[in-house]
Design a protein with these regions (language model features):
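P-loop NTPase Walker
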Residues: 1-127, 131, 233, 287, ...
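Coupling/switch/interface segments within P-loop NTPase motor domains and analogous charged loops
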Residues: 134-206
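Proline-centered turn/helix-capping motifs that create local helix->coil transitions or kinks
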Residues: 171-179, 266, 321-327
Length: 327
């Protein structure tokens, strides 16, 4: 497992006396939430199951950082939906003030898009590239599939949806197409050569038409970080505090993006549920959350265990099931 070495934080915080805080954090949060919110410097893993106040914890931590004097734009909040980040920042603004609205928040893809809009020419793209959504990507693959005359009465070729699933999963899991075919589509193994041809032409089509699909946004951001050290350092310096929601649902590419951004200040906090991952079909891996303490030296782990939604009887059943769970 690759281990990222992070430099000591150079972030400077104002020393604020508890009586000077606008928010009474200690009385408004339970002990575990308070620990997570007030643990500011260094890498942190917050284990938070459903109903334990995960969102509340993130909202209060955003407010706490702003109260400590961190410029909102230097805080990066990455979530799985734009709506989630907007709601968290809205709540933080109500909790503290309008400064929280200036926090940099959004999805991994929207963040990648914003960076690549500025630096895409360094990767061989023209400014103003267009983005293919999943439906567009499937249609392009179908066009190539048809032009190659791969689907005949004698031999059925995978539909565009299957082709896209194979291609996207291969990228997001960093796994060879052969391995995915063997595991999930063994009846298509003999067609691997033709599929590889479709994928190669798909990549050529995108480059010829100045297009990126959703997977390219992540791939190209990582490529930018790897090839342009000065730009990676600039962004890693700019974002002094990084928070990631639903970390158990991140894939290998997203985990690497977080690692690159955290190499200067060391202030990376990820929040997730180590017993739940619902996006494995998109390449999400629970290993990201399980391996986080080993990847980030000096990581502090905080567990939010007080549940505000379920009855104790339900929690007892859930805990008994989890005792026998496997990865």
């Amino acid at each position: 497992m690759k281990k990222f070495t992070l430099k000591k934080s150079s972030s400077e915080l104002h020393i604020v006396h508890p009586q000077q805080f606008v928010i009474d954090y200690k009385n408004e949060l339970n002990p575990s939430q308070y620990d997570a919110v007030t643990s500011v410097s260094g890498p942190h893993l917050i284990i938070a199951g459903a109903g334990t106040g995960k969102t509340r914890t993130i909202v209060y931590r955003v407010a706490r950082l702003v109260e400590l004097g961190v410029k909102p734009e230097h805080i990066l909040l990455l979530t799985f939906t734009r709506r989630a980040s907007q709601e968290m920042l809205r709540r933080a603004s109500i909790l503290l003030d309008h400064r929280c609205e200036k926090v940099s928040g959004g999805t991994f893809h929207s963040f990648a898009n914003s960076v690549l809009r500025k630096y895409c020419t360094l990767l061989g793209y023209e400014r103003g590239f267009s983005i293919l959504d999943q439906s567009d990507s499937e249609d392009v693959m179908n066009l190539i599939r048809t032009r190659l005359k791969l689907d005949t009465k004698e031999r059925r070729f995978p539909r565009k949806e299957t082709l896209h699933d194979l291609y996207s999963r291969s990228i997001n899991t960093v796994t060879a197409v052969t391995a995915i075919l063997a595991a999930d589509y063994p009846h298509y193994l003999e067609l691997e050569g033709d599929m590889t041809k479709v994928f190669a032409l798909y990549i050529e089509y995108k480059r010829a038409h100045n297009l990126m699909d959703y997977d390219d946004l992540l791939l190209n951001l990582i490529r930018l970080f790897r090839e342009q050290e000065a730009i990676r350092a600039e962004l890693a310096t700019y974002y002094k505090y990084i928070m990631v929601d639903e970390y158990q649902d991140t894939n290998k590419l997203q985990s690497e993006i977080v690692a690159h951004l955290g190499t200067i200040h060391h202030n990376v906090m990820v929040v997730g549920d180590d017993s739940q991952s619902i996006y494995s079909f998109r390449g999400a891996t629970i290993r990201n959350i399980l391996d986080f303490p080993d990847q980030y030296e000096g990581c502090k782990v905080v567990k939010l265990e007080e549940n505000y939604r379920s009855t104790q009887a339900i929690l007892n059943v859930a805990n008994e099931i989890l005792k026998h769970a496997i990865e």
